[in-house]
Regions:
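Residue-level recognition of tetratricopeptide repeat
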Residues: 205, 242, 249, 286, ...
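Catalytic-center loop of serine/cysteine hydrolases
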Residues: 46-48, 84-202
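Boundary/linker segments of alpha-helical solenoid repeat arrays
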Residues: 234-235, 269-279, 309-316, 338-353, ...
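N-terminal intrinsically disordered, acidic low-complexity segments at the extreme N-terminus
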Residues: 1-15
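A structural "domain/chain start" motif
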Residues: 23-24, 29-82, 197, 208, ...
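Alpha-helical segment of the N-proximal tetratricopeptide repeat
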Residues: 196-225, 229
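Structural motif corresponding to the intra-repeat A-B loop/turn of tetratricopeptide repeats
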Residues: 210-213, 247, 291, 324, ...
Length: 373
């Protein structure tokens, strides 16, 4: 009896079946490896790109390390340091190729791209069996950590001007930055000739930096006292006029007060010794802006910027751009101002100086930057 035998499987078909699965698993494994390598490289690269900062040797940060001595406290101590820091920053930004960021009012500890750091601190040190308070100023090159300048000053009632002059001269040598003749002439015009008067002026200037109503009122009072006691100090007279016209922009003066202020401004802007100073054009810019004369204000503040690169000039430039409906340019101006002097003071000026500004609307980048703090 014949029985049916099943047909034998073709060797060629079996080989093709085996080859298919070999290649399938090989390609699958290869794809998984490629995906894992891609994910791992992406995961390691992203954090590195956020943390890497290249130093700029021409940028300088000014920081306040310690605001007072433990054994001695003076209402003028901090104002003097703030005034010196503001003067150094404005002088270098105006008369050199360095870009200085005055961070005395900025308390956020974050990485910086500045190649150099100028630190101001008040420290106690035992001197002749007694505790004495020193103002310590140190300039460090962040590229190699070396100290370029290390000075300590004992502040007395009459040596404030001498300390400031010595510091400027020492910075000139440390940075290999000769001061031009125009800077020397400017300092002669904007600073009093007596050290004790400088402390009072810096206290009034500190109130101006704050920018709020109470501070501006106090600044006006102090500057009025300085002008009354030292009428030859015409720069204090100009700064009082600036403070008063800003106060008027926020809370209008009565008719009699405004007439007196306008007369004072007319007299100040004609003083020959102040003609080449930025503050004259700040006064003109604010005065014109209050009256709605944006083109006149724009011309004035740009002349002021040519004479002095300062945070206040760029705040005022931003205000002029806003009034002209040029919000993109206003945002650039406000960011420049905050970059020159970051902190709550400059932010207050941006938001409330002359008129109120919506930072989220006009400068959304700055709003997000501050929110991330």
């Amino acid at each position: 009896q014949n029985t049916a035998t099943p047909p034998e499987q073709s060797p060629v078909k079996s080989k093709r079946f085996t080859t298919f699965w070999v290649w399938f698993f090989f390609l699958l494994s290869l794809g998984i490896c490629v995906a894992l390598v891609a994910f791992s490289s992406l995961d390691t690269r992203l954090p590195m790109s956020k943390s890497r900062i290249l130093l700029n040797p021409r940028d300088i940060d000014i920081n306040m390390v310690n605001k007072s001595c433990n054994s001695w406290s003076s209402p003028y101590q901090l104002s003097y340091a703030i005034g010196v820091g503001d003067l150094v920053a404005t002088s270098l930004n105006t008369f050199s190729t360095f870009m200085v960021h005055d961070k005395i009012n900025y308390n956020i500890d974050e990485p910086s791209s500045s190649g150099k750091t100028l630190s101001i601190a008040f420290v106690n040190q035992r001197q002749y069996r007694a505790q004495q308070c020193f103002m310590s100023i140190k300039l460090v090159d962040n590229a190699d950590g070396s100290t370029m300048l290390d000075k300590r000053y004992v502040i007395t009632n009459g040596n404030q001007l001498a300390i400031q002059n010595d510091l400027l001269e020492s910075l000139s040598k440390a940075l290999n930055q000769p001061w031009p003749q125009r800077m020397q002439e400017t300092l002669q015009q904007i600073l009093p000739h007596r050290g004790a008067l400088l402390t009072n002026f810096y206290q009034a200037h500190d109130y101006l930096l704050h920018g709020d109503d109470k501070s501006l009122n106090r600044a006006s009072e102090l500057l009025g006292e300085i002008v009354q006691s030292s009428p030859e100090f015409t720069y204090a007279r100009a700064e009082k006029a600036l403070v008063d016209i800003v106060r008027h922009s926020q809370h209008p003066l009565d008719e009699k007060q405004l007439a007196a202020l306008n007369t004072e401004i007319d007299n100040i802007v004609t003083l020959p010794e102040l003609n080449n100073l930025s503050i004259i054009y700040q006064i003109k810019a604010v005065s014109a802006l209050v009256k709605g004369k944006t083109d006149e204000s724009y011309q004035a503040i740009n002349t002021g910027i040519d004479l002095e690169m300062s945070w206040l000039n760029y705040v005022l430039l931003g205000k002029v751009y806003e009034m002209k409906g040029m919000n993109r340019e206003a945002a650039d101006a406000y960011l420049t101002a905050f970059n020159l002097r970051p902190g709550a003071n400059t932010l207050y000026w941006i938001e409330n100086g002359i008129f109120q500004t919506s930072v989220p609307y006009v400068v959304p980048y700055l709003d997000k930057f501050l929110a991330s703090e």
